Amino acid sequence: MDKLQYELQGYLEIDRYRKQRFLYPLLFREYIYALAHDHGLNSSIFYEPTENLGYDNDNKSSSLIVKRLITRLHQQNHLTISVNDSRFVGPNRSFYSQTIPEGFAGIMEIPFSVRLVSSLERERIAKYHNLRSIHSIFPFLEDKLSHLYYVSDILIPYPIHLEILLQTLRTRIRDAPSLHLLRCFLHEHHNWNSLITSTSNKSISIFSKENQRLFLFLYNSHVYECESVLVFLRKQSSHLRSISSLAFLERTHFYGKIKHLVVTPRNDSQRTLPLWFFKEPLMHYVRYQGKSIMASRCTNLLMKKWKYYLVNFWQCHFHLWSQPGRIHINELSNHSFYFLGYLLGVRLTPWVIRSQMLENSFMIDTAIKRFDTIVPIFPLIGSLVKAKFCNVSGYPISKSVWADSSDSDIIARFGWICRNLSHYHSGSSKKHSLCRIKYILRLSCARTLARKHKSTVRAICKRLGSKLLEEFLTEEHEIVSFIFRRTRLRSERIWYLDIIRIHGLVPHS
């Protein structure tokens, strides 16, 4: 990590430019685009391999071409749009529409990356790379939700206009030329309208693969500002003390976790503030992408007040119309909610305890709250239907588009999907739903092979034998079986710290 900081501070001269709050000259540094093409930073904890984001490493960066493109961009007149405008047609347009945003996003990420590294080192968090894992959220929920009463399911609204994003960035980036360049680029980008007006899909997948790095940075900045309502409420709520508050910024998917928010009693000089701020209880907040949850031990009335705060703050501060229906408040003991591909809830498990005192014995009926993580079988089957592995009834069908591949390739593809789904849903408290998904994939694989060889499923299974079955067994299943007994393995929740993204078949929106 010291090496990473040395690269950021020395190689990019970040200290000098950060003091001057002037980032625009960095766009004319050729090494910026080398770093944007996975020549330095992408090996750190903040980034994913560039092949996952569609970058073309064969595209050579030239500072002279970049300067020419920036000059042309500034000379364009956005009041008149011509269909025959060919100034950015062909290879130059491809270079312009991808390279400049890559460099701009890389420059904008530098201060956040340095700030995150210093924050983690200051907090002395060991193995903080494990915090990138999506599964790191669930132990937190497992430890806290079973003691809470109400949960609020929130969808963060999207910006309705690009100027809102630019105004948001202006509060943190005071470099006018850089913001002007960003505004020009956003006016040019043909996918921007679909980015900010899409209502059919609220997940982050609406971003185009082209320039995904820049759009993810803008989206993260927008969400970060939307969450600033928590800071606003902290100031309004007197001594609202944050025990642990860390923001994890990543280029792909990132989430902010505020572990505890505690309100302590106010002093006499603050009695003029509203009465209902006096005893606001513990509030927990977790977010992934555009969906977040807030849970608390407070009453339904206080949860409605938090909902009122959020809706009005977003509307007044960001001019975002957030429908109240996007924030659902439910009682945890009677409601389950979808989050990160799991159906989460709190279940009351009855227990009978026998107590004996001297010669008298007592039978005490009690109930223990248990945090449930269930694999949502119907949404998963719906994903399999869209991928054409089964029909709407869950009956396995052949994957016809894979029938031209070799037998080993077909088996490997199905096995890879099955292992990834099993790996991600290893934290499920009930594994029988996952067994059904495995059965659908295994039989779909057999039907695909049978279609290729114009044979029957029984003949294929008899010919391949154990080879077909072994491909669908996860490697960690064999390792974990040595730790837990077979009877406990079906009920034990196992969270892995190497999962940094959700599989495409997992319904998480």
UniProtKB/Swiss-Prot annotation:
Keywords: Chloroplast, mRNA processing, Plastid, RNA-binding, tRNA processing. It is found in: Plastid, Chloroplast. It comes from Nymphaea odorata. Transmembrane segments: none annotated. One of its GO terms (biological process) is tRNA processing. One of its GO terms (cellular component) is chloroplast. One of its GO terms (molecular function) is RNA binding. The gene is matK. Belongs to the intron maturase 2 family. MatK subfamily. This is Maturase K. It comes from the Eukaryota.
